[in-house]
C-alpha cells in the first residue's frame, strides 16, 4: 500500500539530529535492528540522567525532526501515508494500521515513528472502551467513537448478530452521528477500534463480555456451534 521504504525514511529523518537525541529516539521507538523499544527509565539509567530528562530529549528530538530539511523533503512521503490511512477509514486501531500497511513485522516500529512525527496524524491512547488508535480527522474520530459507544449500549448482553446485520445496525448509529454511506470494510475496521464489541469464530458479533463472543476453549466453541444449529450434531460435524 505504501510506495516507499519506511526504514529508509526514518533513517533520513533522524540523520540530522545530534547523536544523543538520535539514539534516544531509536531506543524509544525500537528503530534498531533488534526492534526493541526501551523505557524512559532504562535509557535514563544508561545516560545517568532522569526519566523526565529523557522525555524532554525525546520531545525535543521529535520537534527538531519536524523542523528539519529532511522532514520537508519527505513531505510527499507523509502525504502518501496519510492517503493510506484515509483509504482505510481515517480512524484506525494501531494494530489495524500495522496489519494493513506494513510490508513485514520489522516495519511496525518505523510506521509508529512516522505516525508520531508526522503532523497529519493524531494519537489516542488505549482506554477502557477503545484500543490505541490513530486518526487524521478529529471530528470523524469523535463521531466513530460515539457511534461505537451507542452501538454497545444498544446490544443485549448475550445476543449474537450476523456480521451483515451488525454492520447495518452500526451504520444506523453512525448516521445519527452524521457519518453516512461508508463501505462495509471501513465500518468493520472501525468496529475493531472498540474493546467492548467483538466477533466470535463463527463470524457473529456481540458484546465482548458475552461468553458467546469471548470463546476460551474448544468446549465453548462446540457449545456455540451446537447452539447455532439448534439440534444435536455428531462430534465430527462439530469438529468441522
Region locations from a protein language model:
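C-terminal non-catalytic scaffold/interaction domains in large multidomain proteins
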Residues: 1-240
